[in-house]
């Protein structure tokens, strides 16, 4: 199981060229053998944006009368195949929370051009993406009409994993070792930043373009020495397979890299025209994730029921890990801290990694979360 990689689907330049209807769904992977700072409430200009031709008029308004008892139909698009990032969604579905809220939710796989493209077009109302992957969607003359409305996981759990004892428990140790790169500007800039902050020389890291879909096999076979993983899946996969590893998290080296990954994104017109339905959906979804926090084993069973092809041992272990990560130290599940959100985009702006500056407070809202 893995997340859809921005690195695999489109380069940043190609994404910026998609003026019509989309951007790649995500960057980074939960791949595998097995994949608060001060609160500042900021009004999101993206959510206030008027309807554009990109939306295609797909999102229905609440002003359109429904027959008595008819449920509001919503489409939720995943970023990749079902995994523990999505557990709360499946829990809410299985336990009838959406139905109780008057909603009929269809969960679908992403198209080739990604989840955000489908949400921006209005063909899906909600989906999964990542803050770093959303940057190209926002850094353009005509930003895609989507808004991040919840953080699935409160802190960035990604980092570099390697075989234990080979000196890569800190970034400088990546010197003279093979790193499997997606060859993306943001990715390489982040690696360079942490290596150099640790006193190393990024030019000495051996970059081999490769998309690793099985960390355990890649590390055991010594195809590569270091891999970017999201620990909830790739890291846990090495534990489940009894492979000793070293690991460092990006956020522990540079706090600006504690950005939000993944997030729930929503169509702006749907948020504007169907505010009550959007809030009802987010309230039901929050209940699903809260249940996953309280009962990780039960939540894992629900996910495995929905996606029986998954490795149940890995799912159970990943769920146990994520019970402490979904909300972590936030005041409630889903809350997005403005300082951290803006901090990462500010870093992209300062390092010329966005084609157009992303303004502070842009692209997210906590307005639709239950209070």
Task: Please identify what each model-predicted range represents.
Residues 35, 44, 55-201, 206-211, ...:
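Short, glycine-/small- and polar/acidic-enriched structural segments
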Residues 2-26:
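Sec-dependent N-terminal signal peptides of Gram-positive bacterial secreted proteins and lipoproteins
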Residues 214-217, 222-307:
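Pocket-lining segment of extracytoplasmic ligand-binding domains
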Residues 18-42, 47:
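Bacterial lipoprotein signal-peptidase II cleavage site
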């Amino acid at each position: 199981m893995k997340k859809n990689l921005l690195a695999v689907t489109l380069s940043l330049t190609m994404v910026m060229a998609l003026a019509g209807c989309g951007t790649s769904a995500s960057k980074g992977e939960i791949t595998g053998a097995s994949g608060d700072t001060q609160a500042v409430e900021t009004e999101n200009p993206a959510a206030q944006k008027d309807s554009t031709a990109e939306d295609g008029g797909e999102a229905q308004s609440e002003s359109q009368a429904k027959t008595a008892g008819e449920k509001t139909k919503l489409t939720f698009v995943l970023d990749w195949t079902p995994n523990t990032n999505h557990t709360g969604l499946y829990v809410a579905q299985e336990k009838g929370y959406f139905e109780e809220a008057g909603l009929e939710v269809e969960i679908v796989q992403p198209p080739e051009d990604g989840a955000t493209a489908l949400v921006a077009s209005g063909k899906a109302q909600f989906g999964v993406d990542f803050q770093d992957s959303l940057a190209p969607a926002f850094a353009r003359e005509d930003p895609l009409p989507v808004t991040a409305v919840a953080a699935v996981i409160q802190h960035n759990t990604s980092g570099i994993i390697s075989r234990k004892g080979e000196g890569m428990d800190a970034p400088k140790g990546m010197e003279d070792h093979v790193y499997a790169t997606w060859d993306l500007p943001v990715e390489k800039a982040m690696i360079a930043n942490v290596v150099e902050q640790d006193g190393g020389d990024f030019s000495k890291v051996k970059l081999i373009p490769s998309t690793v879909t099985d960390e355990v096999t890649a590390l055991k076979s010594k195809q590569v020495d270091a891999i970017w993983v999201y620990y909830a899946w790739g890291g846990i996969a090495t534990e489940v397979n009894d492979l000793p590893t070293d690991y460092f998290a990006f956020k522990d080296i540079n706090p600006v890299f504690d950005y939000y990954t993944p997030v729930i994104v929503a169509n702006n017109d749907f948020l504007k025209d169907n505010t009550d339905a959007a809030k009802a959906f987010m309230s039901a979804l929050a209940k699903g994730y809260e249940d996953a926090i309280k009962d990780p084993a039960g939540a894992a069973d629900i996910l495995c029921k929905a996606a029986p092809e998954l490795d149940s041992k890995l799912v159970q272990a990943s769920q146990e890990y994520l019970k402490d990560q979904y909300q972590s130290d936030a005041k409630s599940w889903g809350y997005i801290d403005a300082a951290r959100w803006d901090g990462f985009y500010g870093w992209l702006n300062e390092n010329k990694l966005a084609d157009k500056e992303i303004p502070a407070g842009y692209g997210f809202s906590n307005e639709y979360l239950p209070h």
